């Protein structure tokens, strides 16, 4: 009511500089002169449109959000959360496809990470997924990202071919040719291998020599060959920030067979699949390629006394996708490179993409970082020297014999917490009966609102005719034609209706979101980050706007006859 007069007074001043038809300019002037009077008609229009928007959206919004919220939480039809700290073993995963009516599944590792290297930085949720499998069975809404889930998750991988560095079965020792720039006590050279049995082991090559470039040799008798080389490490006992900085030269890796013959596996100067391991000081290891090998400038930081390089395709960090809250709260951008802290390990990361929302996020934290499951577990296993398994599985289930399928899944995973769409829907307040009830309430409220609006519009029109009778007579006496008079009325009413529709739609959407948010928050589990959608009742909205327009046209017809009548009456009175 306070803003409306100001708007039309400004509009009246603006049109003073523009040459407009008399009916248009006078209509705007009339509203600016009597803005508080016309505000009542405007309030009727705003109330009708906003009220219709709000009440017609309740049952529709409840229904669609109830269904989508369950899908957001389960990702697919069924989601299993393993309670065992050892995760879901490979043999347990193989059992899944033996369960009848299970079409497909995908594994997930959910964990916690923090910014920086102290472990006390800003916390966020880590979701390690299978980029190729998850999009085939997961639910994903169009407004969750600028692209489809499949396109978004492709940013976790790059089309590169990494050649594994393999030690075959006919070797018993391994050698690294290296040299330290100076004498460093209690500093050992290690090589990390993944054996044919899947175990990750460290082979020590002894104290690092500083006198000259020499071979550092380790025994492979306890390694299941063939084995893959994962990393070259330097170990120095001590706390994480007290390691001795020095420069290490690495020339080549050789395998030694049972006849003590050496076979060169790689020359460090020609092999480009190496990157520094982050430490407690971040990315403080600098790697420089020279003509015969590589030089490592090792800083004071370490991971439990370990520094060095690891074999990888991703020299700038493990690709990650983050949500918009992560970017905002941590002041990061796409392609930023930094170190995070996960399970006691410092992990190098590069942000390759972003997503607005992702199913099942916000279970533990508001911020989210998504990894390729294989890539992040490879690095964590390398540093922890133990197998990292997924702790969740999402399953796509055929609807035939659904209940029996759930029982079969539960019997195979007795310790896992199971979330399925059917059970969550049954727990929800958004039942079919509740939807029907709200639909009935909305229908009754709509027709009551419609009746009140039409009565209010009719009442205002009658009162307005009497209130403006003298002004209309003056216009007639001044020679204003019937067409011009109708133009004045048309401008008045159409301006009021246009502004009212705009304000009514905006206020209706706002009020509808608040109302539906209150209803959804009463449900069995409120996910504050789940983006509710407002489903507009277009039929009711179009219907009430159409009836207002019909009433407007009818009002113009009545006013036309009324103006003709009062002019005739005034003419006869003047003649008498």
Give the ranges of each region predicted by the language model.
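Short helix-to-coil transition segments within interhelical loops
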Residues: 31-32, 476-483, 575-576
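Peri-transmembrane interface segments
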Residues: 350, 408-452, 464-467, 488
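Small-residue transmembrane helix packing/gating motifs
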Residues: 73-74, 224-233, 300-321, 355-399, ...
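Short helix-loop junctions at transmembrane helix boundaries
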Residues: 502-546, 556-570
